């Protein structure tokens, strides 16, 4: 069953049609928009700083989202995909962003809209990622501008696929066993 816990009187809040895998963890001051999915072994920890997640966001397997006590918050826009085992820490990710597998985005970084953070990249504290670009490497540096077809062909495609994947669970789990949560059909 997903771990959904209040911390210091602040409880997670979920929009409509959100899927939480049976072993996902969401705690504390977390607000999640409509049509989001939080996959296996993902941790969204709003205990020391608030976390706001927009609509149509997929937080893939093994992702950790957290902040720094009394210093940072996490803000994630709409239509965002956060790849397997990425770490999102005390930063802002604007709309229509793809964060690649194993990437790390540190405190006070801002990832501009329509951007891609390559797999394994490390976005250092305070870095500003330009809108419409691909950044990669350690530390992350600009690789190139994103052509418009890559935005629809990559960023939008992945976000839309995760809506489909969550739908598979919703259809197969009319009465979800093993603790899977599909909001609002299962509370």
What are these regions (language model features)?
Residues 1-10, 47, 53-55, 61-64, ...:
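Glycine-rich hexapeptide-repeat left-handed beta-helix
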Residues 9, 14-68:
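A positional/architectural concept
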Residues 81:
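Short proline/glycine- and basic residue-enriched helix-capping loop/turn segments at helix->loop/beta transitions
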């Amino acid at each position: 069953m997903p771990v959904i816990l209040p911390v210091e009187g602040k409880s997670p809040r979920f929009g409509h049609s959100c899927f939480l895998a049976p072993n996902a963890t969401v705690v504390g001051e977390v607000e999640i928009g409509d049509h989001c999915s939080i996959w296996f072994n993902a941790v969204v920890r709003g205990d020391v700083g608030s976390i706001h997640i927009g609509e149509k966001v997929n937080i893939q397997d093994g992702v950790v989202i957290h902040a720094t006590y009394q210093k940072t918050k996490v803000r994630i826009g709409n239509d965002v995909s956060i790849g397997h085992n990425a770490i999102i820490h005390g930063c802002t990710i604007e709309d229509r962003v793809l964060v690649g597998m194993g990437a790390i985005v540190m405190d006070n970084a801002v990832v501009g809209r329509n951007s891609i953070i390559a797999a394994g990249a490390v976005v250092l504290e305070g870095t500003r990622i330009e809108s419409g670009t691909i950044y990669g490497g350690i530390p992350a540096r600009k690789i190139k501008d994103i052509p418009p077809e890559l935005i629809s062909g990559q960023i939008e495609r992945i976000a839309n696929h995760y809506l489909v994947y969550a739908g598979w669970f919703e259809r197969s789990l009319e009465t979800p066993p093993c603790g899977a949560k599909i909001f609002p059909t299962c509370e």
